[in-house]
Amino acid sequence: MDNNLTSKLKYREAKLGYLMILPLLTVVLVFIILPVMGTFWISLHRDVTFIPEKPFVGLRNYLRVLSAREFWYSTFVTVSFSFVSVSLETILGLSFALILNERLKGRGVLRAIVLIPWAVPTIISARTWELMYNYSYGLFNWILSILGVSPVNWLGTPISAFFAIVIADVWKTTPFMTLLLLAGLQAIPQDLYEAALIDGASMFERFKSITLPLLKPVLIVALILRTIDALRVFDIIYVLTGGGPGGATTSISLLAFNYYNLGDYGIGSAISILTFVLVLSFTIVYLKVGRFRRD
């Protein structure tokens, strides 16, 4: 009798659980799974605007993309941008979070100021940086002219354009890392620090033995979110350089956009699916590394 009652209660709880997550599953199905499946289906066809027929070509679009130098170069640009940007944002975000976690006068105002760049829409932020990078009347070249230094074409060479984009992205997104890591720091019990202080632990020892281990789960989540976002970078590059000079800063998303603009939806969709696979691969690596270190 008791076993039967327990089984019924478990069934009701399971049924309630499924009903609770049903709206979320519906959203995931409609806005994630179906669009990805639709994009994959298009990528299996020669879908070009000026060609009425859309013949099924299988994986031919993928072979064409994978054999193209521009795809691998854009992949290199995207991965390099993600690595440099996320690394800098993590270091700066953790530094700001540690400072804002201290009991400072006016830290509420400081937190609000730090979050301002994140609140600015990316298009507006990128346009502002574009004006500051301008060769003729930009802020940076104006400062150089005061110092007696020749102006620099910040967006005119591949290397300078790459780092110009990185700087703009770091300024925009570091507050996001700061916010996540600050929330993780505030969840760490202060008793641990007080006990370590009594034991004579230095600031570095407290950071190494208490802060980093307890902050690691939040740090991994922050890295996953930022890496996913960085690998999909489009808007800030589109506004600042448009992929130039000479395609030197073209990301994978921008490359797919260019093919869509040309009306080649089959190739554009294939690049989009490969971008999805790239993002998924990095996410799995982060999760595996994080789980291994926790174990």
From Swiss-Prot:
Domain ABC transmembrane type-1: 75-286
Gene3D superfamilies found in the cross-reference section: MetI-like (1.10.3720.10)
Main subcellular location of this protein, as a coarse class: membrane
The keyword Chaperone is assigned to this record: no
Transmembrane segments: 16-36, 79-99, 112-132, 146-166, 210-230, 236-256, 267-287
Intracellular or extracellular location(s): Cell membrane
Pfam families: BPD_transp_1
UniProt entry keywords in alphabetical sequence: Cell membrane, Membrane, Sugar transport, Transmembrane, Transmembrane helix, Transport
Entry membrane topology: Multi-pass membrane protein
InterPro entries linked to this entry: MetI-like, MetI-like_sf
GO terms classed as biological process: transmembrane transport
A GO CC annotation given for this chain: ATP-binding cassette (ABC) transporter complex
Subunit relationships: The complex is composed of two ATP-binding proteins (MalK), two transmembrane proteins (MalG and MalF) and a solute-binding protein (MalE).
Role this protein plays: Part of the ABC transporter complex MalEFGK involved in trehalose/maltose import. Responsible for the translocation of the substrate across the membrane.
Protein family (similarity comment): Belongs to the binding-protein-dependent transport system permease family.
Protein name: Trehalose/maltose transport system permease protein MalF
Gene (UniProt): malF
